[in-house]
Structure formats: structure tokens, C-alpha cells
Design a protein with these regions (language model features):
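Membrane-cytosol interface at the C-terminal ends of specific transmembrane alpha-helices
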Residues: 181-185, 189-194, 198-201, 205, ...
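Transmembrane-helix boundary motif in ABC transporter permease subunits
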Residues: 88-97, 179-211, 224, 386-394
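Transmembrane alpha-helices
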Residues: 209, 214, 268, 273, ...
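Membrane-interfacial helix termini and adjacent extracytoplasmic/periplasmic loops
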Residues: 127-167, 222-259, 329
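Interhelical loop and adjacent transmembrane-helix boundary motif
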Residues: 325-376
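Interfacial/capping segments of alpha-helical transmembrane domains
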Residues: 23-28, 64-66, 115, 119-146
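Transmembrane alpha-helix signature in integral membrane proteins
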Residues: 68-84, 164-194
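C-terminal transmembrane helix and the adjacent membrane-cytosol boundary/short C-terminal tail
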Residues: 271-274, 278, 285, 312, ...
Length: 398
């Protein structure tokens, strides 16, 4: 610890010495060029500040029981940084350019890290999915109509390779997503229109934060809501109509998922509508348009790119949802498009396949990566198509 303090005081000494040298150089430059030059802040000021913060860090490390050699290393690094920083305070030093360079490099580093993480995820998914397709033919996976990986294992031996047909899983994912979007999209868009154009500002300021808070509720809470309230309600309602409905149905899961998604669409659509220029409102009303004509023919088309973006976000959330499906729709894959039947989704099956003590190299476990790969590709294609649609609307609206 004593050596660490010595390193910091040595840094202060270097800063003070360099400060005197630099001031002398600047005075000479001032005399030669007859200009009024002055430091924005003296180098010793930066060294004092840096040393104080470094000393605080060293004290915290010492109290935390960190090894003394590590503390000494940090002190020496701090001294080097101070020395380098003070050395860079030259006559022609331009802090603005250096900060701009540092900012650009930071942005480049952040973008590179994001790209590398994405590539790493893709490599992991593609690699493990490739192992799965070496065991199970891709034709069987993408076109098979029987999904029951539990039957494919018997004492660790693969016995039934025809149990990995993923069509029922993808069909269930599509069904629940459609139910959720049929609930969330109309309510979200109409609620945003009402919130933006008809509500008072005080009412809007009260309701919008509440709706945004709903978006942060854990999905397991929505799952309990579906199991305890929505599923029994649908059971009672359809029972009065003499219509049979499963206790774990795609309708209850999709309905609750739609409720969960409403705040996303409503909040983003509200922001999009408020970003439409006021001149378009006034121009439409001046031409004799009714409120309905103004909203349907002027406001909504102008905000359509952002609305499509909110719908894309909602679809991605619906496709990736797991807990609501596991709790209220079950894990049984069926070849059905009836929302009153029980079904499952790809994400729920991924959780099911990765749960337990089975070997990582088994086809049952590797099947989860095949499902993940399919979801990744489908979502990627969907986002590309959505970007094309957004550009089309942007060109159409000028």
C-alpha cells in the first residue's frame, strides 16, 4: 500500500515538473508570436483530480482485500496515464480533434463488439444445428408432421428418428402469434389514436406512463393471469355456448400475449402520430375533411413506417415469448389450426428440450438448436421484408 501511495505522489511530481516546463515553453511561444495563449486548465489540476480518484479506488481495493501487487500495478498504470496525459499538453495540442477521434473510435468499437456478438451467436446456432441435421434429415425436420422427441430416446439410444417433424411446432407458433396480433394491433393503434388526438394532455400524461409500466411486468405474471382468470373465463363462456375448448388453449395464451404486447404498439404508435407535422392536421381540416378522413387518409399513412416498426417489434416479442405459452397453452404439439385446442410454440419446445440431464450431443438436445436456427432465419427474412415495406411507404409519402 505504501508503494502505491509512492507511485501516486511520483505522478504528482511528474505533473508539476511538466507543468513548469510547458508554461515556460508557452511563455517563449507567446513572446515570439505575440499571441495571448493560456491553458484552459493547468496540467497539475488534472493530475490532482486523477490522483484523488485513483487513491479512492486504491483504498476501496485495499478494504476489499485485493492483493497488494494488484494495487501496485493499478497505481503504476495510473501514474503512466497521468504522465502520458500531461506530456500530451503541448503547444499544438488540439483537444477537440482528439476527443472527436476518441468518440469515433468508441463508436466503431461498440459497433464491432455488437457485430462480433451477433456472429458468435450465429456460429453457435449454425454449428449445433449442423450436428443435428447430420443425425436427422432436414426433410424430416421441416416437413415431418410428428413432433415427440421424448419417444426418440430409450435408455440413451436413438430409436425413433421420425419424431422430429417440426411442422406442428411452427404451426402452433403461427397460430398463437396470429391470435396475439389480432388482439394487440387494433387495440394498440386505436388506443394510440385516441391518446394522441382525443385525450386531454393531462389525461395523456397520466395514462401513457401507466401503459408503459405494463410493458415491464414479468411475463410469468401474465402467465398466472392466463391460468387463473382468462382460461377459466373462456372455459365458462364457450361452455355456455356448448362449444368445447381445452383448458390449455391457444386462444387463452394468444389473448394474454396480445394484452402484454398492447403497450409496445400503443406507445410507439403514439410517438409516431405525435411526430406528424401539425400542418398536415390543419391542411386536412381546412379542406373539409372529417376527423375520420383526416386520421385514415392523412395521419395513419404519414405515421405508417413507424407503425409497421412497432408491429414488427410486437411480432418478434410474440414469437419469442415462452412463459405464457408454457403456463397456459402447454407443451403438446398438434397438427391443428383451431385456437380452441392446446398447442405449443418453438420457444416453449426449446426450453423443454434443454431441461433435464440428457447429453448435450443427443438429438433431443440438438433439436433445440434446429428450432432456434429456423426462428432466426424466419425472423431475419421477416425483418428484411418489413424494411422493404417501410421504404416503400416512405417513398410514397415523400
Amino acid at each position: 500500500m505504501i508503494l502505491s501511495f509512492f507511485a501516486l505522489f511520483f505522478a504528482l511530481y511528474l505533473a508539476k515538473t511538466l507543468e513548469k516546463k510547458l508554461i515556460y515553453q508557452q511563455v517563449r511561444s507567446k513572446i515570439k508570436r505575440q499571441i495571448n495563449f493560456k491553458f484552459h486548465s493547468l496540467p497539475i489540476h488534472y493530475s490532482y483530480c486523477f490522483s484523488i480518484w485513483a487513491l479512492l479506488l486504491l483504498i476501496l481495493l485495499y478494504l476489499a482485500g485485493v492483493n497488494g501487487f494488484l494495487i501496485l500495478f493499478i497505481s503504476l498504470v495510473a501514474s503512466f496515464i497521468i504522465f502520458f496525459a500531461i506530456y500530451r499538453f503541448r503547444d499544438k495540442f488540439n483537444a477537440k480533434n482528439h476527443l472527436d477521434w476518441l468518440f469515433k473510435k468508441s463508436l466503431l468499437l461498440s459497433a464491432t463488439i455488437g457485430i462480433l456478438i451477433t456472429i458468435a451467436i450465429m456460429m453457435a446456432i449454425f454449428g449445433e444445428a449442423g450436428k443435428f441435421f447430420k443425425i436427422i434429415a432436414w426433410q424430416e425436420f421441416f416437413f415431418g408432421t410428428k413432433w415427440n422427441p421424448q419417444l426418440a430416446m430409450n435408455g440413451g439410444q436413438e430409436v425413433v428418428k421420425s419424431s422430429f417433424g417440426a411442422v406442428p411446432v411452427f404451426l402452433g407458433t403461427l397460430l398463437i402469434t396470429l391470435v396475439a396480433m389480432s388482439v394487440a394491433v387494433p387495440i394498440g393503434i386505436m388506443g394510440a389514436v385516441n391518446l394522441s388526438l382525443y385525450c386531454k394532455s393531462s389525461t395523456r400524461d397520466l395514462l401513457k406512463p401507466i401503459l408503459e409500466i405494463l410493458a415491464g411486468i414479468p411475463t410469468v405474471v401474465y402467465g398466472y393471469f392466463a391460468v387463473i382468470f382468462i382460461a377459466p373465463f373462456f372455459k365458462l363462456f364457450f361452455g355456455l355456448l356448448n362449444i368445447e375448448i381445452a383448458s390449455e388453449s391457444a386462444l387463452s395464451a394468444g389473448f394474454v400475449m396480445g394484452i402484454m404486447i398492447i403497450p409496445f404498439i400503443l406507445s410507439l404508435t403514439d410517438d409516431a402520430i405525435n411526430s406528424v407535422p401539425r400542418s398536415l392536421y390543419d391542411g386536412a381540416l381546412a379542406m373539409g375533411s372529417t376527423n375520420y378522413e383526416m386520421i385514415s387518409r392523412v395521419i395513419i399513412p404519414s405515421a405508417m413506417p413507424a407503425i409497421i416498426g412497432s408491429i414488427i417489434l410486437a411480432v418478434s416479442r410474440a414469437v419469442g415469448e415462452t412463459m405464457i405459452v408454457v403456463m397456459s397453452a402447454g407443451l403438446l404439439a398438434k397438427m391443428t389450426f383451431n385456437p380452441l385446442d392446446s398447442t405449443t410454440t418453438a420457444t416453449a419446445q426449446i426450453v423443454s428440450l434443454l431441461s433435464g440431464d440428457q447429453e448435450f450431443s443427443s438429438s433431443k438436445t440438438l433439436a433445440s438448436f434446429a428450432l432456434a436456427l429456423t426462428l432466426f432465419v424466419v425472423t431475419f427474412i421477416f425483418n428484411i421484408l418489413a424494411l422493404i415495406v417501410i421504404k416503400k411507404y416512405q417513398k410514397k409519402n415523400g
